[in-house]
């Protein structure tokens, strides 16, 4: 029996098993086996040749955003509208066959936008170019899931399932579980909170399935067996996702209102160029970027060339971005902006910068 058949059998077994106290250990084991087989499926084949058209794109700009969706939901049209890149767009499926990059220039930042080929159902099993599409998606900072508003619910659940099966966790945080395999001493299990979904016995069963008999486990939050399996496997990607419902000109106002109220969702129409500005604002928020402007002594700030950093970046991060040796020569910095009580304020390396702050660095 091949890996795909084993995965299919386990999925059927999970679907027909009623969830209750008596079956929780059985379900936990099935989920551990399923995660193990899926990990094997995603490993690149040793016999596979490396010939063929290049697919991955070199990372550039200040952030990377992956456009994911089924064929013909409007990804190529969106890329053409947002960037200067022309991605071939047509009203039939599978127009885009390779990964097309573009750059959005917004608030001084260059955001790389990747138009990935349309995902079809079963992409995780390698159908179409699904596996390559998902591999590129794992390298992004944010995923934009493009959905056709006329069939958005069906597409959304299918795409979420595909991404979940390859270890991409959308709009979730990494489980707060400390896990460390050891050479001996058995399994040490502790928790700082009351656990309602995992027990010591279930944790041991899951670890034994992965041939781990000596480990230290500490739960700092109430997690499910699936989340614990994610911690053991360790190659999961936790990523913010923006659900974008396109073609809202083809549905009723009531349906548009319902979709717009969903969490992490934006409604747009690429054909009529509706709501694209709001989508850019939301994307900026999800990327959590800040613009920092520099100032030389006795001169005006340079507002033409911003330093783009992650939200919560310190003065030390700014120093490293300017020059790697600057932090070692640092004496103090003068900062103007919302991060200070008064302007300018003299600060040290640990000071946290805010969006559109101005900084002047003084060396020793």
From Swiss-Prot:
It is found in: Nucleus; Cytoplasm. GO terms for biological process: cytoplasmic translation; signal transduction. Residues 288-363 form the TGS domain. Its EC number is 3.6.5.-. Polyubiquitinated. Belongs to the TRAFAC class OBG-HflX-like GTPase superfamily. OBG GTPase family. Catalyzes the conversion of GTP to GDP through hydrolysis of the gamma-phosphate bond in GTP. The lineage of its organism: Eukaryota, Metazoa, Chordata, Craniata, Vertebrata. This is Developmentally-regulated GTP-binding protein 2. Disulfide bonds: none annotated. It catalyses: GTP + H2O = GDP + phosphate + H(+). Mg(2+) binds at residues 76, 96.
